[in-house]
Amino acid sequence: MERLLALMARLRDPVEGCPWDREQTHETIAPYAIEEAYEVLDAIQKQDWQAFPDELGDLLLQVVYQAQLAEEQGRFDFADVARIVTEKMIRRHPHVTFGADVLGHTRQAEGAANNLPASAMPGQWEMLKEQERKRSAQLGGQKDQRLGALAGVPPALPALIRASKLASRAARVGFDWPDVGGVLEKVHEEINEFSVEMHKGDREKMQDELGDVLFSIASLARRLKLDPEACLRQACDKFTRRFEAVEACLAQEGLSMQDQSVDQLDALWCAVKKTEKP
């Protein structure tokens, strides 16, 4: 770790560092953190354990890079980042006894300790996060009433993930359908409203209504305990697999997709589907 920190400091050296790295700011390198996180996810999904440590390293580099920029500005350094996340994880695990290697002293677990079932952990985690948000707001001079149920959901999240989190937060305070059937009815209702605007041809209203359709579908996934982002990734993978299979079938005959009719392509698509395991 020390070598990596020293390397980043060297890359940012005003005299002997890398010209490109010296020019970067928090804002210019921020997109790389998202890109690297998705590459980590891709390696996990593919179970590419050879590439996995490499991708994790690329993601870690983004954390080190941002910390180096902050250190240069006198805000904090990497040690602060590690300390803050360690203290946060300790706070959020009151049911675990940590030794001197973590705390510098031993601590007895609180409450029911390790008797807490795993199913209770997400609820406890969210409760502790909410307490932290309130303390943070109070330290910042905000009043409790400004911390609504949706506080802390970052607008920069991918839209499907954000929709799922917003719906989940709302459900925790009772803003939810009594059963999954109600959510499904809402999906159909939003699709019908979109259909009306689509036939009118008003693109602004179409966008608004299609957004409602997507949000309601994310809510349906949340109610079914499904990850909407994972569901869509799976659908994308399936589409890619089938599309490439159609291309391969045509290539074997020396044909291209552009020369086929819609009916011919649909027939090939259905044939590919039948070859897949149910």
Pin down the residues of each PLM region:
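Flexible "arm" and connector segments at domain edges
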Residues: M1-E55, L61-L210, L214-P278
